[in-house]
Amino acid sequence: MNRRDMLKTVSAAIAGTSLLGMEALASNPHAGTSPAKKALIIGAHPDDPETGCGGTMLVLEKAGYEVVSVYMTKGEAGIPGKTHEESSAIRVAEATKASEMLGARPIFMTQIDGSTEINKERYVEMRELIAAEKPDVVFTHWPIDSHADHRVCSSLVYDAWRR
């Protein structure tokens, strides 16, 4: 099963399921009675936020959080046999649909799949995004992930969040 098929299967299963013993949060009677909190989920590629913490995103959304799904790239190199333009069009459409299913607002950044970079400009871009969104909680990749783009994303997010 490829990631695309897995995401479809998992999304269907999540729709009617509470996850990780988070029933109390998901059924929060105070949701909507206080200022909304915001969760920012930042992944390197389309599908990373959903496959990494889609269940948590859904539970937070049901608890009244504003959930924002940030994609550092548009998945340009994500589909073998497709051009970067074809692949990014498909992956952006999939991520947009997944965000809709999870009650999240998608944001697409400007890095290129497979060629992500850490430099002063990229730190500024991430810091400005986080400052503009003003999240209460941020989720991202594990810093020692096997995928280079995931490690870049984690480093940028961690350093931007600390400042």
Question: Model regions: which residues?
Answer:
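Active-site rim/loop-helix segments in enzyme catalytic domains that contact anionic ligands
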Residues: 3-19, 26-133, 162-163
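Histidine-centered divalent metal-coordination motifs
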Residues: 45, 141, 147
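Short, well-ordered, mixed-charge alpha-helical segments that flank or form enzyme active sites
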Residues: 117, 146-148
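Proline-aspartate-enriched helix->loop->beta-strand connector
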Residues: 129-130, 134-144
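Short Gly/Thr/Asp-enriched flexible loops that form oxyanion-binding sites at enzyme active sites
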Residues: 148-161
